[in-house]
A protein has these predicted regions:
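Loop-centered beta-sheet repeat module
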Residues: 55-119
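Short, conserved, GDST-rich strand-edge loop motifs in beta-rich repeat architectures
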Residues: 42-59, 105-120, 167-184
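Single conserved hydrophobic/aromatic residue that forms the stacking wall/gate
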Residues: 2-13
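Conserved beta-propeller blade signature
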Residues: 39-41, 102-104, 166, 222-225
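Structural signature of eukaryotic scaffold interfaces centered on beta-propeller domains
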Residues: 27-36, 91-100, 150-162, 213-218, ...
Length: 264
């Protein structure tokens, strides 16, 4: 319910009470945050009574906090696209900034579990504290180059450079009866072209379940998890070619749920 403000790396200095931003339960469900130009932008999931927001709450919310005054400036809301749930709390890279200083926010759309809600990506441009009205990329129902079925929501996303990000798209077309996006073997690894709003299938990885899908920068490339019906492990991805090394760097018994490389 609270969010910690930060003035630079490691300098946590005051607790912000954001309960007033929550709907119905005084808990806005703070997700991923980023600091830019003296402001912290915090995605809000707005979950009520479970893992989803209410059916009639079709908007994406972000709290804006001034790090100089330690005060909440405002909550910004995007209400025209039908997006909901700004950022995925278990994916630290679902809110990120490109080289231009523009912030991108991945919205989950209630994991496709609530009718009428959509997943997509929003932007807050450099120097602004409001959503960019010219940018809203709808992921739900979008086509993926090299994939016959349409997208559901972005299960994970990791920004690399030059408008390209990598991650997984949950595809409801692969669900078996009674399955949801977490347990189903239905997540496809893709390249996100943020500037042109396009997705492309990454060859060499099978469909994964919804747990082994996270991606991290790794040395000069990326480490990408995968939990398919045959193998669970972490693979190396070359962002220059978008190619996967077919031999996993590490194999795991359980789902490789989180990855973070500590290096230069």
């Amino acid at each position: 319910r609270d969010v910690l403000g930060s003035r630079g790396l490691g300098d946590v200095y005051k607790r912000q009470n954001l309960t007033s931003l929550g709907i119905q339960d005084n808990n806005p469900d703070i997700g991923i945050m980023i600091e830019r130009d003296g402001y912290v932008f915090a995605g809000l999931s707005q979950m009520v009574g479970g893992w989803t927001s209410p059916e009639n709450y079709k908007q994406a919310d972000v709290a804006v906090i001034d790090t100089k005054t330690d005060k909440l400036v405002k909550m910004i809301s995007e209400k025209t696209s039908g997006f909901s749930q700004a950022t995925r709390p278990i994916d630290p890279k679902s809110l990120f900034m490109d080289e231009k200083g523009d912030i991108y926010i991945s919205c989950l759309g209630n994991f496709g579990m609530v009718a009428g809600h959509k997943a997509g990506i929003l932007r807050i441009k450099k120097g602004e504290t409001d959503f960019d009205p010219t940018y809203h990329w709808t992921i739900t129902g979008a086509s993926i180059e090299g994939e016959e079925k349409v997208a559901g929501f972005a299960a994970s996303i990791c920004y690399a450079a030059n408008g390209k990000a990598y991650g997984y798209i949950d595809i409801p077309g692969y669900y078996k009866p009674g399955e949801t996006g977490h347990g189903a073997i239905a997540s496809r690894a893709v390249v996100f072209d943020l500037y042109n709003q396009k997705m492309k299938k990454i060859e060499g990885l099978d469909l994964s379940n919804g747990y082994g899908v996270l991606v991290s920068k790794y040395k000069d490339g990326l480490a990408i998890a995968n939990a398919s019906t045959t193998t669970k492990g972490i693979y190396y991805l070359n962002p220059q070619t978008d190619k996967i090394n077919p031999i996993p760097m590490i194999t795991t018994i359980g789902n490789p749920m989180a990855i973070e490389w500590f290096g230069n």
